[in-house]
């Protein structure tokens, strides 16, 4: 991937692979290992070498990679995204109502519920399996349609097209076929283990459609999980293009879990993953408290999470002064309530970097009468206390089972992030940047 041209096909493979947060993390770690990054389990003692390339995971659903400074620590580059997407969490393996095989589910994140009806679905996640020496995790995702969530026919709900209020406990429960059979047995066979050795599991429903180009000229693409795996992959690609020419700068790329439900878990942005890794790096280098503060001031963190493009059928939902066009470039996200971390100061630095890369920038802001959503940047900021900027890419149908985005924008993000990782960034004094442009 390093020194290779950005490829939409590789992005599509990443989107297709990321059927659960555990699978997204596995896909990312496979890329990192292919690029020579060494796994450092959190439970092990770390021996870190100057200029070394490493990664660690937490809960199997969050991953952080870094390049060690070659000299005395002077600053940081970092990009953060998330591994999870709205879906349905399976509460138990299997029930029967006398006619259908079922599995109880509950909503994970703020999905568009109707988009999940009448699609072939599979099950994805991890099994916790008893072994001779303890417990192991096994990823599973059978490559076949295991379930569907059947719609209520129009004849039984004449008002269905006039605005249906869905009850997830009633309307969104999937069926897994007729009587007989066992979901646990199917997943055990998939994992190559005995069903009785499965002690527990973290499982979700996943769509089976593959990422595909769309449009008369193939300028758009459709996929599940574009939010936020598009940003995860493009920032990872940019991170891997970093040349590491600055002796004292450390580079970080991180993909957190549980953003869609508030980021408050141990593996989420409000957890201590990044803070813990920073502390261990600094300790291994013998960094003083003063050096640590200076290095964290000479930093700029990218919080990368997609935003809403102006909808062609509902332009009135977007800020009229700042329309977002798919294919129009990377989003710079602002919010007066600080749900986005971008300030004029950090926005200026990122804009300058994008100009150098030849990447267009669009301003994303909500209407003044719409509170909008939030993301992981302001939550991560509580842990690491570094200057930050919220960025993303415009897309349609966010939180649908299938979303739509721009091919050109994906390449813009990759180019911008690659330029960012190769641009020296320093604050000679408060309110001023010195950029190696």
What is each residue range found by the language model?
Residues 1-437:
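N-terminal hydrophobic/helix-forming segments and targeting peptides
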């Amino acid at each position: 991937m390093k020194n290779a041209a950005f490829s939409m096909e590789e992005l599509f493979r990443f989107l297709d692979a990321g059927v659960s947060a555990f699978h997204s993390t596995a896909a990312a770690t496979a890329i990192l290992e292919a690029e020579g990054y060494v796994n450092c389990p959190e439970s092990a003692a770390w021996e870190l070498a100057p200029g070394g390339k490493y990664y660690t995971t937490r809960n199997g659903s969050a991953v952080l990679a870094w390049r060690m400074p070659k000299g005395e620590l002077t600053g940081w580059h970092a990009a953060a995204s998330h591994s999870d997407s709205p879906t349905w969490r399976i509460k138990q393996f299997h029930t029967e109502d006398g006619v259908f095989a079922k599995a109880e589910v509950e909503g994970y994140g703020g999905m568009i519920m109707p988009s999940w009806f009448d699609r072939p679905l599979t099950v994805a996640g991890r099994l916790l399996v008893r072994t001779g020496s303890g417990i192991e995790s096994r990823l599973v995702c059978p490559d076949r349609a295991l379930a569907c969530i059947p719609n209520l026919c129009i004849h039984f709900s004449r008002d269905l097209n006039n605005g249906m209020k869905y009850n997830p406990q009633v309307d969104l429960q999937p069926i897994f076929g007729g009587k007989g059979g066992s979901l646990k047995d199917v997943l055990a066979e998939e994992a190559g283990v005995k069903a009785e050795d499965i002690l527990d599991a973290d499982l979700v429903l996943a769509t089976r459609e593959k990422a595909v180009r769309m449009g008369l000229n193939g300028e758009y693409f459709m996929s599940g999980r574009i939010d936020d795996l598009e940003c995860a992959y493009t920032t990872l690609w940019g991170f891997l293009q970093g040349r590491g020419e600055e002796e004292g700068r450390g580079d970080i790329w991180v993909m957190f879990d549980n953003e869609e439900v508030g980021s408050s878990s141990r593996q989420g942005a409000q957890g201590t993953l990044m803070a813990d890794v920073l502390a261990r790096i600094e300790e291994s280098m013998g960094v003083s408290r003063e050096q640590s503060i200076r290095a964290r001031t000479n930093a700029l963190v990218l919080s990368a999470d997609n935003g809403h493009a102006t909808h062609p059928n509902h332009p009135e939902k977007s800020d009229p002064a700042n329309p977002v066009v798919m294919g129009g470039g990377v989003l710079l996200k602002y919010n007066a309530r600080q749900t986005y971390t971008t300030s004029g100061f950090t926005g200026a630095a990122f804009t300058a970097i994008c100009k150098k890369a030849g990447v267009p920038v669009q301003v994303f802001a909500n209407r003044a009468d719409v509170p909008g959503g939030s993301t992981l940047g302001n939550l991560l900021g509580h842990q690491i206390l570094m200057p930050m900027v919220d960025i993303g890419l415009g897309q349609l149908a966010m939180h649908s089972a299938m979303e739509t985005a721009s091919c050109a924008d994906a390449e813009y993000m990759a180019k911008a992030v690659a330029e960012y990782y190769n641009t020296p960034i320093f604050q000679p004094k408060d309110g001023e940047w010195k950029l190696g442009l």
